[in-house]
Amino acid sequence: MTKPTTMAIFLSIVLLSMAQLPSLVAGTGRPRVIIIGAGISGISAGKRLSEAGITDILILEATDHIGGRMHKQRFAGVNVEIGANWVEGVNGEKMNPIWPIVNSTLKLRNFLSDFDSLAQNVYKDGGLCDAAYVQKRIDLADEADKSGENLSATLHPSGRDDMSILSMQRLNNHLPNGPSSPVDMVVDYFTYDYEFAEPPRVTSLRNTVPLPTFTDFGDDNYFVADQRGYEAVVYYLAGQYLEADKSGNIVDARLQLNKVVREISYSSTGVTVKTEDNSTYQADYVMVSASLGVLQSDLIQFKPQLPSWKILAIYQFDMAVYTKIFVKFPKKFWPEGAGREFFLYASTRRGYYGVWQEFEKQYPDANVLLVTVTDEESRRIEQQPDSQTKAEIMEVVRSMFPDEDVPDATDILVPRWWSDRFFQGSFSNWPIGVSRYEHDQLRAPVGRVYFTGEHTSERYNGYVHGAYLAGIYA
């Protein structure tokens, strides 16, 4: 028997209260439900409520736009995605719910990412690494990962006897510190950190290997490179129940932008939400779709304080940092063509500007490269001037391509999700030591306060489809 979702229970409670107290909202302007945050999870939660007949809602969004971490920014003459970029998990037995919206309904430009030719595209200081050697190291890493899948399957589903991915690697290759050569480190980084934004030493084996996103929906990833932005998905969902103008901009009064929630008071009879501009809103229920990073900060105060079991659940889970740095050059000096989209830099310093992507197909003639960093490198880079980051990048690319005339970059874009008080990170990662029971507590309601967001998705935390489904099913 399938247990009911939090959203199903929530809908039942709200609908019952509407039947019993029909005059509570009528004529007062008081919404039945306040939703905090207009990312894809908050917007999809509003859509689900509206479909159930609960239309007296109010969405409070801290920024000046909807979409949350699905957000485009103008750079080098094109719109690039500074947050979510891929539809991850496509062409499997099940349909990723985001894919038909992207590919069929909105027809957003997207491109299948080719991760299969990495052995030919690993660079060290001085140029390319030997492809045959790199392939052997990749094969060994793949064997360890497969062993990890087998080991993960033997661990109790509750997660009570979990271990880190690094512990699994130690069991398989008997290296106390895991992969340690430059090539092994960058292959390991690409396999795990590039996916989870945190290293194997902190990431749960039982809850991430294999990843349900790919076992459920397929192994393919499609890179969205449409000038409307990946956020067009959120605007499409919002337009299903909120009034929009001819340009697709939401003009419905039930969506309030630039409303920074600072306090949520809750009792057995209702909730009161206060914002930074001294506005006060009352409702029967509140649904919080703020990021895990925000919940772990002091941006929003709960009165009374959340119970200890809830606080522990919030602080045990990880909010990771994933930074996509876009760099504009006056000309191309890097290889292009089939099998060249991604290339790696094998540094003696793990995670140091390791994963690169060129945009021959996505943004032709833009002369832009993307380099991704995560975790401590992300935090370090966010705190230094962009000029310093640019100088470090120039040193790396000239080291990788010593025989090329590498010009100075003309522009750089460094997103700062960790420093942004409205996000305080990029997406959640499941760390070692957090059981399924504790994750259930993370998404569980506290009285009239409900929670949604990608971090509340048991199978797909950290992903766009996880955020969407969390809003639908909460």
UniProtKB/Swiss-Prot annotation:
Residues 1-27 form the signal peptide. Pathway: Amine and polyamine degradation; spermidine degradation; Amine and polyamine degradation; spermine degradation. FAD binds at E61, R69, V261, E454. Its cofactor is FAD. It comes from the Eukaryota. It holds the Pfam family Amino_oxidase. It catalyses: spermine + O2 + H2O = 3-aminopropanal + spermidine + H2O2; N(1)-acetylspermine + O2 + H2O = 3-acetamidopropanal + spermidine + H2O2; norspermine + O2 + H2O = norspermidine + 3-aminopropanal + H2O2; spermidine + O2 + H2O = 3-aminopropanal + putrescine + H2O2. Its EC number is 1.5.3.-. Optimum temperature is 37 degrees Celsius with spermidine as substrate. Optimum temperature is 30 degrees Celsius with spermine as substrate. Binds 1 FAD per subunit. The keyword Glycoprotein applies. This is Polyamine oxidase 7. It is an enzyme of class 1 (oxidoreductase). GO terms for biological process: polyamine catabolic process; spermidine catabolic process; spermine catabolic process; thermospermine catabolic process. Glycans are attached at N103, N150, N278. Optimum pH is 7.0 with spermidine as substrate. Optimum pH is 6.5 with spermine as substrate. Belongs to the flavin monoamine oxidase family. Flavoenzyme involved in polyamine back-conversion. Catalyzes the oxidation of the secondary amino group of polyamines, such as spermine, spermidine and their acetyl derivatives. Substrate preference is spermine > spermidine > N(1)-acetylspermine > N(1)-acetylspermidine > norspermine > thermospermine. No activity detected when putrescine is used as substrate. May play a role in producing hydrogen peroxide for secondary wall thickening through lignin formation during anther development. GO terms for molecular function: flavin adenine dinucleotide binding; N(1)-acetylpolyamine oxidase (3-acetamidopropanal-forming) activity; polyamine oxidase activity; spermine oxidase activity; thermospermine oxidase activity. It is found in: Secreted, Extracellular space, Apoplast. SUPFAM superfamilies: FAD-linked reductases, C-terminal domain (SSF54373), FAD/NAD(P)-binding domain (SSF51905). InterPro entries: Amino_oxidase, FAD/NAD-bd_sf, Flavin_amine_oxidase, Flavin_monoamine_oxidase.
